[in-house]
Amino acid sequence: LGRYLFYDGRLSGRTHPDSLMSCATCHLQENSFECGIDHPVYQEGHPHGLTGIPTPHLMLPLINLVWNHNGYLWNGRLWKDNPDPYRRNIEDLVWMGVVAPHEMNGDTNRTKALIASIPGYPPLFKKAFGTDVVTMKRISMAVAQFVRTFISSNAKFDRYMRGEVQLTPSELNGFVLFTTEEGADCFHCHGGFGNPLFTTNLFYNNGKDTVFPGIDDRYAITGDPMDLGAYKATTLRNIELTGPYMHDGRFATLEEVINFYSHGLEWSPYINPLMHHIANGGTQLTPTEKADLIAFIRTLRDEEFLTNPAFGPPDQLP
């Protein structure tokens, strides 16, 4: 049921061909359920909704979210203990996507009425929930459960860790750089040996800026000045397919990202203390080290995830 709804443009509550929009309109499987810089409609990875209003940030990929317990979106404004009961989990993300002006710009009553009117859907709700009554809560639950099945665990690096393949010398050197403070120092925020998610799902000021309006960063949620300029550390799984990078898409390529961490960091009083190389402006990687690091990061590409038909569009919608 969730798979059908995820791919059904009528989730927007409309039937006109120019007004159809589904979750999959922006969240493309081939881009790790992110938009990607090469999206056929949204140039340079900057999506907008049916109203033409651009999204305030680049989207985050929908990958391994079942293990994210530290909040959703770039600033974590949805978290499990949020006093607002409608801003807590993936189900609420689905709801928000339907009504947000920069996404489907829909109306929940219109959406549930339209879905209920499609003959194939009530029997599917009956199978899933024991009743054929369509509600927005059940729509959100079904889509959220489908999204929770988006698990990536079979990249080349996963197979290396299972002893099934070997890394090249360049990839292996990149792995060493990734997991050492003296190297590229990536692992504090993006995991390593003991964190196969390749993210902590936490929020960091990583030295991108020196001026912070505090409007949409982590500070806007916590009110803690040390969260000024802090945004979620994204997973690095399939990262080569999810550019442009950072919350505002300022870097188009992985090479630009690595150059930034190597020699482009900017100090501020709010820099995260894990940015150990801030005094030098970055990790000062050599060209060979940069190439090795990118070679390792590309071992996190999971072709099985990107092509799994269970995650893809159904042959026919109800």
Which role does the model predict for each range below?
Residues 1-318:
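Periplasmic c-type cytochrome electron-transfer domains
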